[in-house]
Amino acid sequence: MATLEQRLTDLLEAPVVALGFELWGIEFIRAGKHSTLRVYIDGEHGVSVENCAEVSHQVGAIMDVEDPITEEYYLEVSSPGLDRPLFKVAQFEKYVGQEAAVTLRMATNNRRKFKGVIKAVQGDMITLTVDGKDEVLAFTNIQKANIVPNFG
């Protein structure tokens, strides 16, 4: 069965693309009474506040009609930013050579958190070089991943 995020991606990807943006990813964060649906968009030339407002208006209208989330929530539309989250295998491929912070669902080698350089992507296996050692992680076991910005 598809997760809520997967169902929302299926619902919203085509309308976001039709507006000229890439649907980078979706997070649904439950926090008591104040859940948040966060929609990340990216564009060839970046994303402006006006772009986010335009996509927010369209996404809000679709969500009102389709009503896939029955509880109350806040809708946020934003750029993924410099520390962009990675939601898809293709995004890991795009950032080979960049540093990433990864949290796993289940521990590998007695660890759940890794920070290292994305070395390679083969199928759904991500190789991360951590402290000079290669760690091969299954994409399906990744709970959360973000690019670590390099300001040097």
Swiss-Prot record:
GO cellular component, one term: cytosol
Example GO BP: translation
Matches recorded under Pfam families: DUF150_C, RimP_N
Matching InterPro entries: Ribosome_maturation_RimP, RimP_C, RimP_C_sf, RimP_N, RimP_N_sf
Keywords linked to the UniProt accession: Cytoplasm, Ribosome biogenesis
SUPFAM superfamilies: YhbC-like, C-terminal domain, YhbC-like, N-terminal domain
Main subcellular location of this protein, as a coarse class: cytoplasm
Compartments (UniProt record): Cytoplasm
Family named by the database record: Belongs to the RimP family.
Alphabetical list of PANTHER family matching this protein: RIBOSOME MATURATION FACTOR RIMP
Chain's role: Required for maturation of 30S ribosomal subunits.
Name of protein: Ribosome maturation factor RimP
The gene coding this protein: rimP
